[in-house]
C-alpha cells in the first residue's frame, strides 16, 4: 500500500497527516489560519519525522482543494504542487464537501451546506451511501428551499441556517475524517486517478468577492 501525505488548509484549522497500510500514522493540526503559510512545512516535517519517513518515501500527495478559505486553499495547493513537482510524485485533489460527506454515517439522503458568506453556501447533495448526487455549487440560501422540500437532512456549519428545520450542525473547523479520506485516496491511487500538476486549481466555486444580493 502507498505512503500518502494529506494536506487540508481549507478552513482555519490546518491539518497534515500521513497514512501507511490504510491507517493514519501521524497527524498534526494548527488552529490559526493566519499562520498556515508559516507552519505548513513545519507540520509536514513533523509528521514525516514521527513516521520515520522522508519525502522520498511518499508515493503521492492528497490535498483538500476546497471550497473554503481562499488564502488557505492557495497555501495548501501551492505547497502540495511544489512538493509533487520536485519529487515527481502524483497529486490528488479532493473536494471538501465530498470529504465531509464520506465521513458521515447516515441512513438517509442528505445535503452538505457550508457557509460561504452571509446567506451564501457551498452546497451538494448525497445519497444515503455518501455518493454525490449533484455537483458542488455556490448557492444563496433561498436557492436551497426547493431542496428542503425534498425532506433532505441538511448538514451545515452555520448555526443560523434556516432553509430547513431538518438539519444537523457540525463544527466549521472540525478535522476531516481521515479514515474515509484514506479509503478514497488509496482507491484513486490504485486506479491511477491523478490530477494534472500543471493545471490543478483550487475548487473556489465562487468569485473572491461577491456583491450580488437576491434581496
Language-model features: locations:
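Generic hydrophobic alpha-helical segments
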Residues: 40, 44-47, 51, 101, ...
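Stable alpha-helical structural segments in soluble proteins, enriched in small hydrophobic residues
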Residues: 47-51, 86, 104, 178-189
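A glycine- and small-aliphatic-rich helix-loop capping segment at beta-alpha/alpha-beta transitions
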Residues: 21, 77-85, 128-132
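Surface "functional belts" at beta-alpha junctions
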Residues: 23, 32, 90-177, 190, ...
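N-terminal beta-alpha supersecondary unit
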Residues: 1-63, 175
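DPxDG-like acidic metal-binding loop motif
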Residues: 60-91
Amino acid at each position: 500500500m502507498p505512503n500518502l501525505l494529506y494536506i487540508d488548509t481549507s478552513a482555519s484549522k490546518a491539518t497534515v497527516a500521513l497514512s501507511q497500510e490504510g491507517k493514519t500514522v501521524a497527524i498534526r493540526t494548527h488552529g490559526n489560519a493566519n499562520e498556515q503559510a508559516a507552519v505548513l512545512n513545519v507540520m509536514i516535517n513533523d509528521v514525516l519525522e514521527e513516521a520515520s519517513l522522508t519525502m522520498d518515501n511518499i508515493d503521492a500527495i492528497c490535498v483538500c482543494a476546497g471550497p473554503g478559505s481562499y488564502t488557505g486553499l492557495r497555501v495548501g495547493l501551492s505547497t502540495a504542487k511544489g512538493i509533487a513537482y520536485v519529487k515527481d510524485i502524483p497529486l490528488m485533489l479532493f473536494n471538501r464537501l465530498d470529504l465531509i460527506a464520506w465521513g458521515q454515517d447516515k441512513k438517509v439522503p442528505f445535503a452538505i451546506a457550508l457557509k460561504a458568506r452571509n446567506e451564501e453556501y457551498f452546497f451538494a447533495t448525497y445519497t444515503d451511501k455518501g455518493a454525490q448526487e449533484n455537483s458542488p455549487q455556490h448557492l444563496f440560501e433561498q436557492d436551497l428551499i426547493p431542496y428542503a422540500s425534498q425532506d433532505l437532512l441538511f448538514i451545515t456549519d452555520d448555526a443560523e441556517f434556516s432553509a430547513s428545520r431538518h438539519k444537523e450542525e457540525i463544527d466549521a473547523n472540525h478535522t476531516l475524517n481521515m479514515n474515509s479520506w484514506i479509503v478514497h485516496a488509496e482507491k484513486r491511487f490504485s486506479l491511477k486517478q491523478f490530477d494534472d500538476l500543471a493545471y490543478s486549481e483550487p475548487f473556489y466555486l465562487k468569485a473572491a468577492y461577491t456583491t450580488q444580493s437576491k434581496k
